[in-house]
Amino acid sequence: MKVGLLKDIKDGEFRTIMTPNEAAELVSLGAEVYVETGAGEGASFEDADYVKAGAKIAKDMKEIYATCDFVTKVKELEECEFDLLREGQIIFTCLHPAASKDEVDVLLKSKVIAFTAEDTHRYGSPNCEIAGKLGLLKGAEHLLRTNGGSGQLICGAGGAPAANILIIGAGLAGTGALQLAY
């Protein structure tokens, strides 16, 4: 099977859905892995890291879609990708189908096999833990006086009291926030 990793093009998206270690694992299982140039840069992975893992670097998304049986990335498809889909191709990404009727219509019309990555985590969602920790950090950022906050630190300092925080929920996100807070 030919597996393709796309570079996410959505503004503000820096994650990658496949690390070089995961690419190496797929290669060891007999897959040919293609990585769009720059696909891992936002997550601090260079093209050379993927090449070292046994992947081939593709020049653009068109090459990935034309070459690969299985195509993956983090965020939902962009309109510029719709015409690149091929019948029978497997798409694995965070589709959020309830949010985009147009995207669902394109997926159905193109006859791809689409999986929503947001619903298929093996051990719950590691992204939820990350979201909880980042949420706490964002809250701490808003406490800074330069950002209009009270100037308190979550942990307190120099005899000043710590800020009071409220974490709603005790799932993976809430637990992640709690781990960072204490």
Model-derived regions: residue spans:
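An N-terminal-biased, well-structured beta-alpha scaffold segment characteristic
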Residues: K2-V106, S110
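Hydrophobic/small residue at the entry helix of a nucleotide-binding pocket
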Residues: A173
